[in-house]
């Protein structure tokens, strides 16, 4: 079945008796099932996109397109196109249909590859190999630690037959679009580059996965600690270093893990993100809350929120309450 993501447009006959589309705006056709070219005319008429299927059917037959298949997906056409151009464009796009690709915020690149491959006709092993390829990292200005910061989760329109390499190029293009001058100015004002901002955002995200409205406040706390040359002492970084993301409680033995990601042991930011970061958290870091807090502790109410404090004495009080 074919659905339209646009209200309506008509085909009319101009002075040269040539069928043209009556406006210049685009129309998006959404095809839920594969459609034979011989069926296109009737479908367009049923959706009030053509006055009659006769001309387009004759043209399709003349071009020997009738046995071709328009695969399910989304196709963008223009109102101003002639019938001839409409048929030609649909023929060119028949195997390049568009889908909404959801790039999720997940724990690591392995999970991401599985999610992407399930939506596209991709080899997940090949895609993961490319994600770990140092030449790919260098090509786009990253390294093995920072490459995951290039992924900006969102829903994007892509061709279903996109290759693994083209997908990475597409992801890189969306990264560049996301980091516009406004965001870059804010990052520069903080004194960090994009990967460092994303790394900090990944810690904020993994620290608070329930109450999103607390992200900017937590970001402000970590920025205060960085400015004060204090260790971040962020539990999620230790869990990442241990490869134990579901560890419920950290003990002193865990804090001794020798890893650059262990922010209990080393000052500053870890070398790269500890997850694929939701862009909203990146924005929360760029627009962090300004305060003097340097400690936080989960509230005893188990509400998902934290008690924040600016002194160790106050922090110890909250710890006892918890």
Q: Residue locations for each model-derived region?
A:
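Hydrophobic membrane-insertion alpha-helices, especially the h-region
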Residues: 1-7
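Bacterial extracytoplasmic/cell-wall-associated proteins, especially those involved in peptidoglycan
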Residues: 102, 120-122, 136-322
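Signal peptide-directed extracytoplasmic domains
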Residues: 7-178
